[in-house]
């Protein structure tokens, strides 16, 4: 083989993925070959007879060329897979094809568009401008709401107003002629503004519907209509009120806070009580020769009697 022809063929076949040899081979008859997908996205390999990819002046040399195909006389070439189109030959690169175009978006897979931020799909599948709101009383152009004649764009840029002397509320829009249009979940009240619709047992609190507990939920929170959930250290009592809990009973007193006992009037804490949950009677003047058994009431020891009726002084009999 002429050396110049050898160099020319080598350059061509490096592009299509074949190698050149001076060995003589007999090409087999053309056969069907299923394209095989390569690891590169959208790039497939196709096996074809070498003679089909040679220029006319070199076809007579086909029998001297050994390809890299699965049979003598065949070679593998790179092509774009179905649904892809070529964008570069060196290096070989294919990109997804969307024949109808994507508008304000990019073709990310065969016939699949991904819209840019602020755009959405139109009826024809292309990406078009989408305004932040419904663009009421206006037209959406380039992701901006252009108001119809006689209407003015609201500061939030979502819709155009035609003049309302009153505020339609957070769930309403002015549609012109002093009329409010309410969004889903809102309804016109007697003042003509939009008010949130709350289910029975709920009330509007700011921008949400919250459950209603008619008696309130002191030391707890209202989690459902008429139902309180107590804070830690509290529990519902028989009156359905969140009352403090004490792990030990409060003798002659009451549980005033979680694990805190408060003595009743006329009683004081028993210094000998380990848990601080026992209260004992208090006698202001003390009980000489006796025991304070109730607030300001003494019982005399054996062999002693009250000095006088109503007295807390005990004397020997």
From Swiss-Prot:
Subcellular location: Secreted
A GO BP entry: defense response to Gram-negative bacterium
Keyword hit for Transmembrane: no
Signal peptide positions (record): 1-23
Keyword flag Hydrolase: no
Region (May be required for E.coli agglutination activity): 24-33
Cystine connections: 98-107, 102-113, 115-127, 131-140, 135-145, 147-160, 164-174, 168-180, 182-194, 213-222, 217-228, 230-242, 246-255, 250-261, 263-279, 283-292, 287-298, 300-314
Database matches in Pfam families: EGF_FBN_1st (PF21364)
Main localization (coarse): secreted
InterPro entries named in the record: EGF-like_dom, EGF-like_domain, FBN_EGF_N, Growth_fac_rcpt_cys_sf
SUPFAM superfamilies referenced in this protein's UniProt entry, alphabetically: Growth factor receptor domain (SSF57184)
Entry keyword set: Antibiotic, Antimicrobial, Disulfide bond, Immunity, Secreted, Signal
Domain EGF-like: 93-128, 130-161, 163-195, 208-243, 245-280, 282-315
UniProt GO cellular component terms: extracellular space
Remaining remarks: In mouse bone marrow-derived mast cells (BMMC), inhibits LPS-induced expression of the inflammatory cytokine Interleukin-6 (IL-6).
Function: Binds to lipopolysaccharides (LPS) present on the cell walls of Gram-negative bacteria, behaving as a pattern recognition receptor (PRR). Induces bacterial aggregation and enhances their subsequent clearance by the innate immune response. Binds to the inner core oligosaccharides region of rough-type bacterial LPS. Displays activity against the Gram-negative bacterium E.coli. Does not display any activity against the Gram-positive bacterium S.aureus or the fungi C.albicans.
Protein name listed in UniProt: Epidermal growth factor-like protein
